């Protein structure tokens, strides 16, 4: 019991520390994030939370690419799945990825109309990440068993 409590609390502290340090880098993108969020009816904090989780607001990127050169940009779009638009840190890139997020959320809402909004949002975030939406049963986090990705994005969005 103590070990899992410690791990959970340590994880929360780590997310808080990284989110706080990412806020400084995210300020550079505040205006494009807010513009995209307004146009797509998204909470700008959700976009910022994904940017923080995926690329640490650009800190983890090499000229816009992840280490394996498979994902691109602040929101880490896979080059196999999508045509890339704009520079890695541009409003165009943020708009492209945020549009994919909105489509993912709407797909989950259509497939699971009885889910709560929180469940649909979590499923949409997961679908954005995993590029899949084949959920038959809702669990705490359909992304993975330890709830890490979706919970991390949501917690980062709260900072």
Where are these regions (language model features)?
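Secreted/periplasmic proteins that engage bacterial cell-wall peptidoglycan
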Residues: 10, 34, 38-72
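A generic alpha-helix surface/boundary motif
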Residues: 30-31
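Non-catalytic cell-wall polysaccharide-engagement segments
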Residues: 1-11, 19-27, 38-40, 68, ...
């Amino acid at each position: 019991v103590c070990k899992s409590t410690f791990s959970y609390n340590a994880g929360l502290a780590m997310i808080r520390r990284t989110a706080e340090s990412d806020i400084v880098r995210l300020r550079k993108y505040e205006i494009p994030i807010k513009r995209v969020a307004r146009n797509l009816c998204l909470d700008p904090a959700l976009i910022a939370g994904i940017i923080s989780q995926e690329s640490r607001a650009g800190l983890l990127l090499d000229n816009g690419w992840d280490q394996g050169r498979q994902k691109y940009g602040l929101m880490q779009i896979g080059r196999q799945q999508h045509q890339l638009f704009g520079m890695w840190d541009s409003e165009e890139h943020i708009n492209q990825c945020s549009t994919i997020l909105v489509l993912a959320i709407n797909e989950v809402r259509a497939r699971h109309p009885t889910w709560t909004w929180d469940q649909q949002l979590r499923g949409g975030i997961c679908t954005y990440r995993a590029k899949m939406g084949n959920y038959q049963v809702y669990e705490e986090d359909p992304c993975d068993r330890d709830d890490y990705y979706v919970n991390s994005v949501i917690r980062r969005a709260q900072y």
